Amino acid sequence: MNATIKTLKERHWKESQAHSSWQIFKIMAEFVEGFEALSKIGPCISIFGSARTKPGTTYYALSEEIARRLSEEGFGIITGGGPGIMEAANKGTVLANGKSVGLNIDLPFEQRPNDYIDKDKLLNFDYFFVRKVMFTKYSQGFVMMPGGFGTLDEFFEVVTLIQTEKFRQMPMVLVGKKYWQGLINWLEDVMLVEGNINPEDLALFEIVD
């Protein structure tokens, strides 16, 4: 039994090593494609939020309006390319004749690209970390709409890059005081009190309605 387990481990490890070597080329290809496409667009704002937000809801309409106004100011709009908040933001961009970018991710349960992305600005990714580089590298600001784990991941990614000075400080807005207030309370009452962040870290972003 032990010999069988050892054999399986060794086989799995060798197969994993071989697969990892080929993955490098796929990762490099995603970086190159992303850099080439996004470097041509100009100043952009990334808008993050839930894929589950339905048309006709307050935050869907608000996302559409925010994207439309930012587009009218000359910014390209980058989203995750899926439904919900992402669709709303891309839709608002198209209505303003702006540059509508979608960074779609291949997932087992979602998501197909929404219908409001410029055809030459739709990129598909297998790797979340490559996709996040594209969001952050080419954005001059960030809008965080209500969302789930993915949105929180993106929020903490950006705020960490700014806090650690890997990024210059730039506007980061959390939209929806009622939605975000619980998180802010935790940051203030737990993380700050425990000494794990500094008071100035809480000034890296702003909450609005």
Task: Say what each PLM segment does.
Residues K99-E110, M145, V159-W186, P199-E200:
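Short, acidic/small-residue loops that bind anionic groups at enzyme active sites
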Residues E10-L103:
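Glycine-rich beta-alpha loop segments
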Residues D126-V175:
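Active-site/ligand-binding-proximal alpha/beta "capping" segment
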Residues K137, G141, N198-D209:
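A charged, well-structured terminal subsegment
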Residues A51-T53, G147-G148, K178:
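Residue-level signal for short, function-critical loop segments
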Residues N114-I117, E194-D201:
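Short, conserved catalytic or adaptor-binding loops enriched in Gly and charged residues
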Residues G84-M144:
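Acidic/glycine-enriched connector segments
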Residues G84-K91, W180-L192:
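Glycine-rich, charge-decorated loop segments at or immediately adjacent to ligand/cofactor-binding or catalytic sites
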